[in-house]
């Protein structure tokens, strides 16, 4: 474990970070980020006096970046208490974690932490100090990215009743997760079932986590209501598309210094993340190829001028490979075995299993620098694997810009307020925020860009059948 428990001058030590001395740097960057996050800061100002999250004890599992620090401080400004961990072993910005710890917020995040560390920290964000009378205190809200915090409580509760659910791990990550659950159950056989019923709800940030929630609900396993933040238009069409359009290339270039112009860039998946990734590569004059399973998305890619191919075909021709599907083994061992010498392979989807990284463990790995590895095949060929197949934009870069994260985190904050304040209105299920709140976030964001919205006249509003103040589109409208 490469983390260290750092103790501050006020004896607050409920955190695990890399280096508390980085907090000054973190604070300076947080102040800059605030100026680029108009939507989130406007919500902080609007609701601060009302304290709508007073009494909320939020377990947060999301990338511990500078932008997330602004989110944490916003939740606290609205009355919440939080405990935080990163949702990815490589995505933490250590100076951001230090700034949050120095301010007295429990945070457990170190860039490059091990998988064992990761699951230990995910447990720690559910472990609150007892109250003044010595009574136990539990989380009552979850703010999740990828669904790991939600998964932990559900799987652990099942394991209390049937330990066999931990018998057959399917990956290195599951081995570490299952071992972590076994360790906690050995100390407290009801650790999970004591905490699960206390959760009022979860707000989920990303596509992969949303898929998990819908599947759990379909199977009757979801224990509390969830708000799907990912499918708010001002999240998915902005964070997923415009955020990836800027952060993908930043991560690749920081890692490799490669010239992108003229190279064949293969984008696996043409959803919102794939669209942004393809735009980024084309903007730097790459030859962009797209792989897709969905004929509609494939047709969109073709109409944008991209060449639509299969990965089987692209493998031996591509120079740069980017997975953004949310699926499993999109790039397999056999694909990588066919790739050119020095081909670059990376992922911008949430989990590392889009690329069959486990199959590469049999070969020699030569570390170039943090999160950049040469994989050396028996014939001497090398491919460059970035962030061990995890999120390249956060593993090798600093993630999305503050401005676009303002939209996402404004939605997260609104969702936390809505679910915490109106829990009785949400039976167990998966929900999205109403369109008028989506439009509110967009209005707040527009102010930063010196934009001017046209106002409908009464006659115009009546003619198209909408309210002058919106919402302007029906729920089924596709932006």
Curated annotation (Swiss-Prot):
The EC number on file is 3.13.2.1
Q: Where does substrate bind?
A: 65, 145, 205, 235, 239
Co-factor(s): NAD(+)
Q: Which PROSITE patterns match?
A: ADOHCYASE_1, ADOHCYASE_2
| Disulfide bonding pattern of the chain | none
Q: Where do the TM regions start and end?
A: none
Superkingdom assignment: Bacteria
| Cofactor: binding details | Binds 1 NAD(+) per subunit.
GO biological process assignments: L-homocysteine biosynthetic process; one-carbon metabolic process; S-adenosylmethionine cycle
- Keywords per UniProt: Cytoplasm, Hydrolase, NAD, One-carbon metabolism
Mostly located where?
A: cytoplasm
Cellular location of this protein? Cytoplasm
The UniProt similarity line reads: Belongs to the adenosylhomocysteinase family.
- Name of the protein in its database record: Adenosylhomocysteinase
Q: Which organism is it from?
A: Herminiimonas arsenicoxydans
Q: What is the lineage of its organism?
A: Bacteria, Pseudomonadati, Pseudomonadota, Betaproteobacteria, Burkholderiales
């Amino acid at each position: 474990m490469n983390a260290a428990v750092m103790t501050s001058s006020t004896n607050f030590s409920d955190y695990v970070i890399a280096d508390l001395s980085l907090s000054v740097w973190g604070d300076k960057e947080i102040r800059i980020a605030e100026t680029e996050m108009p939507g989130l800061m406007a919500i902080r100002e609007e609701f601060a006096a009302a304290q709508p999250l007073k009494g909320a004890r939020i377990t947060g599992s999301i990338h511990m970046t500078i932008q997330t620090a602004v989110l944490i401080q916003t939740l606290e400004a609205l009355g919440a208490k939080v405990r935080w961990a990163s949702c990815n072993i490589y995505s933490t910005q250590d100076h951001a974690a230090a700034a949050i710890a120095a301010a007295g917020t429990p945070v457990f995040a170190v860039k490059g932490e091990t998988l064992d560390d990761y699951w230990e920290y995910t447990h720690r964000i559910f472990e609150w100090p007892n109250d003044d009378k010595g009574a136990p205190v539990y989380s009552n809200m979850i703010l999740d990215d990828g669904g790991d915090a939600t998964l932990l409580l559900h799987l652990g509760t099942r394991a209390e009743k049937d330990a066999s659910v931990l018998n057959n791990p399917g990956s290195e990550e599951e081995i570490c997760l299952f071992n972590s659950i076994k360790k906690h159950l050995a100390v407290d056989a009801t650790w999970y079932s004591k905490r699960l019923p206390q959760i009022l709800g979860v707000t989920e940030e990303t596509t992969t986590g949303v898929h998990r929630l819908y599947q759990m609900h379909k199977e009757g396993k979801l224990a509390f209501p969830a708000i799907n933040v990912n499918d708010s238009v001002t999240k998915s069409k902005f964070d997923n598309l415009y955020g990836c359009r800027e952060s993908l290339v930043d991560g690749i270039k920081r890692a490799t210094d490669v010239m992108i112009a003229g190279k064949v860039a293969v984008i696996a998946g043409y959803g919102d993340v794939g669209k942004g990734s393809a735009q980024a590569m084309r903007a730097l004059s790459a030859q962009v190829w797209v792989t897709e399973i969905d004929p509609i998305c494939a047709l969109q890619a073709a109409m944008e001028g991209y060449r639509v191919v299969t990965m089987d075909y692209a493998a031996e021709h591509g120079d740069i490979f980017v997975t953004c599907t949310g699926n499993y083994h999109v790039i397999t061992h056999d694909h990588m075995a066919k790739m050119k010498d020095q081909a670059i392979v990376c992922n911008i989807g949430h989990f590392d299993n889009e690329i069959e990284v486990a199959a590469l463990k049999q070969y020699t790995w030569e570390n170039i620098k943090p999160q950049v590895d040469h994989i050396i095949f028996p014939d001497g060929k090398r491919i460059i694997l970035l962030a061990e197949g995890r999120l390249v934009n956060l593993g090798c870069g600093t993630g999305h810009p503050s401005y676009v994260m303002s939209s996402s985190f404004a939605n997260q904050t609104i969702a936390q307020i809505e679910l915490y304040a109106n829990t009785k209105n949400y039976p167990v299920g998966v929900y999205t925020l109403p369109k008028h709140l989506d439009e509110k976030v967009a209005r707040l964001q527009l102010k930063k860009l010196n934009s001017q919205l046209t106002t409908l006249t009464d006659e115009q509003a009546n003619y198209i059948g909408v309210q002058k103040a919106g919402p302007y589109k029906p729920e089924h409208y596709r932006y």
